[in-house]
């Protein structure tokens, strides 16, 4: 470790604000430099958000709110804004007591309980708040949300990946019922069929990304095709975990700010920006394993640590990305998948 990194390590807490233990390879010097700049941004945004939320109907969908969300929601307002813009608040208001009923019913479902219990200790082992022996431990809250959601959405039930999403929602909302309704918004409406047994939505969007790369970054597309690498091997975790455990926590939360407001199109913007930023690095790959390694490497480093700069880039770098274009590509890929499964 160089001297600058050692000095920074002495001043930056080993455990972050969300309870995650910083990894061994964590670059303290880069982080310290970023956070000094970012605190200024956070202070400015917090003042603007406080003023906005004092107004009536402040979080209605508007150009102003969209601009504010893209620039980041302060942590103290994040839970409230996510609930309103995603429609989760309205659903919760219309379904008083529903979350509790689903949990009670779910507790009678041994298959669901087995699946949920299997993954509890695997959820964020690097987070002190999710450890079984922590006091308080978020594991019980995670269990309650996953059991209730599995009972609510019987088509999906429970599948791996959902535990990480529920965990992040609990960290942000600090409320089981809100986390449940935000999961309903994400899995039921924003990302339909990502977590269904056939995972049609997930498979479709991975191939749609392939189409977008072919159009916008043809050299990368040619390299991947030449080595017979399937997109699912490179990006399935990006999509299914919504960049959790892929990108830094604060960067993921900034992405989710936009995901709840603008929908799944944001995931394509993130993926395309990463690939475009590191295009030259990816093109150095000489074989199949090389390509896979490069795609793991591009999710680390200073570019993704500076979440504010990164978010500016995702709305600039990929260029135009209309809903019409994505809908057409999705339809094409759905038909392709259906024909392959016959």
Curated annotation (Swiss-Prot):
<dbReference type="Pfam" id="PF00566">
    <property type="entry name" value="RabGAP-TBC"/>
</dbReference>
<feature type="domain" description="Rab-GAP TBC">
    <location>
        <begin position="72"/>
        <end position="263"/>
    </location>
</feature>
<dbReference type="InterPro" id="IPR035969">
    <property type="entry name" value="Rab-GAP_TBC_sf"/>
</dbReference>
<comment type="function">
    <text>May act as a GTPase-activating protein for Rab family protein(s).</text>
</comment>
<dbReference type="GO" id="GO:0031267">
    <property type="term" value="F:small GTPase binding"/>
</dbReference>
<dbReference type="InterPro" id="IPR050302">
    <property type="entry name" value="Rab_GAP_TBC_domain"/>
</dbReference>
<protein>
    <recommendedName>
        <fullName>Growth hormone-regulated TBC protein 1</fullName>
    </recommendedName>
</protein>
<dbReference type="GO" id="GO:0005096">
    <property type="term" value="F:GTPase activator activity"/>
</dbReference>
<keyword id="KW-0343">GTPase activation</keyword>
<dbReference type="InterPro" id="IPR000195">
    <property type="entry name" value="Rab-GAP-TBC_dom"/>
</dbReference>
